[in-house]
Amino acid sequence: MENKEAGTPPPIPSREGRLQPTLLLATLSAAFGSAFQYGYNLSVVNTPHKVFKSFYNETYFERHATFMDGKLMLLLWSCTVSMFPLGGLLGSLLVGLLVDSCGRKGTLLINNIFAIIPAILMGVSKVAKAFELIVFSRVVLGVCAGISYSALPMYLGELAPKNLRGMVGTVTEVFVIVGVFLAQIFSLQAILGNPAGWPVLLALTGVPALLQLLTLPFFPESPRYSLIQKGDEATARQALRRLRGHTDMEAELEDMRAEARAERAEGHLSVLHLCALRSLRWQLLSIIVLMAGQQLSGINAVNYYADTIYTSAGVEAAHSQYVTVGSGVVNIVMTITSAVLVERLGRRHLLLAGYGICGSACLVLTVVLLFQNRVPELSYLGIICVFAYIAGHSIGPSPVPPVVRTEIFLQSSRRAAFMVDGAVHWLTNFIIGFLFPSIQEAIGAYSFIIFAGICLLTAIYIYVVIPETKGKTFVEINRIFAKRNRVKLPEEKEETIDAGPPTASPAKETSF
């Protein structure tokens, strides 16, 4: 009656996936060993920064019989902080080659080398009396974070069934925030943030990597990688059987076969070809604006220098570390709240609300810092502003851009888009980490005016350019951007192929 008359088999109905133990444990193993690393190393040098600076000064004195001057210490500490995102930039450029040659799971396993080696080096840096080991290790840890920032979402997204991808996708950001929070806890002076405990504090970053090395090999590789990249349907079928807990997987396998055919016809887009395609111009510009806005709006300035900000806002130095822990609780709660609301309120509403809160908090914080000496009571308002900023960033600018990034690109261009996204993320992260101390020293409270302006400009771009993607298929989103890019979307194109000019030649697969 239906498809039989046309000589084609009836469509295979898809079966809703459930959160099976294998999928749950694979997600936890991958996220703890990768996303946790990013969050932990992002925050671990914040609270005990005076302890690290003291070690730098003592080591320098033993070598040169004199202490560092203020400018040299500022430069060295800025390097310690900013080497992490610089390594992340390098890692983001390597990930495209690794995920295709070694697989998604294989990339995560290899990446643990870049966590275990620096953990050992930082653990012995005090005994070796070499602060250079800390600076070098921060670069290597950045490479680790840069690779996992792209490889982990790719792995989890390809493990999960369609109806669970949103939930599984939020696990990455949740573990990043948990890593930040535990680093804040362990960094307390009463625990490890002291002259005796800081080598252990830094070396702990190797523990999640070691646990992932011991557990992740027992879980399957991405079935999409096995079938589409390697052409191994038997391995993909076996992986799906373990991940789904049933043998009714023909619909999902057929979807992968269609994607494999589309990729053979279209090929992977390289980064250079992605940048040249008119049909992807607004999508590319949108992820650049979203990722640059995420970092340049000041979130890592707050993470890196939270204690200094609290002290400037009137909190006693002895108590600022506990206020930082409180901000970590706010971060976790609001990130989980965002995961709950993103499918109810939509992406645009959370982004606009988040940037609105962040920009307003920066403006009020500027006023507080300027006048708190005259009105001491304003110091409490300063703490509220910092907490409000963290809440605003956690509800939108921090967790939502990775969701939008996945939705506005289709399969053939997604890998190249992830590389661009990662490069922008880490480059802007590096800029803030390196320049913020000098900017704060030069213009003081007015530095937060810059962040408020960036929040405003990013919000305007989102309001004018980025459509609401909630509840829309990839094809529907692609059609919206096709109109914006002023290109025609051929109706016969598969969902897995990006819109482009009909005369465009297939792009050859390259890593960059």
From Swiss-Prot:
Disulfide bonds: none annotated. Residues 1-21, 100-107, 160-172, 220-281, 343-350, 401-415, 467-512 are cytoplasmic. It is found in: Cell membrane; Apical cell membrane. It is a multi-pass membrane protein. One of its GO terms (cellular component) is apical plasma membrane. GO terms for biological process: D-glucose import; D-glucose transmembrane transport; dehydroascorbic acid transport; fructose transmembrane transport. Residues 491-512 are annotated as: Disordered. Residues 43-78, 129-138, 194-198, 303-321, 372-379, 437-445 are extracellular. InterPro entries: GLUT, MFS_dom, MFS_sugar_transport-like, MFS_trans_sf, Sugar/inositol_transpt, Sugar_transporter_CS. Probable sugar transporter. Even if its physiological substrate is subject to discussion, it is able to transport glucose and fructose. Does not transport galactose, 2-deoxy-d-glucose and xylose. This is Solute carrier family 2, facilitated glucose transporter member 7. It comes from Rattus norvegicus (Rat). The gene is Slc2a7.
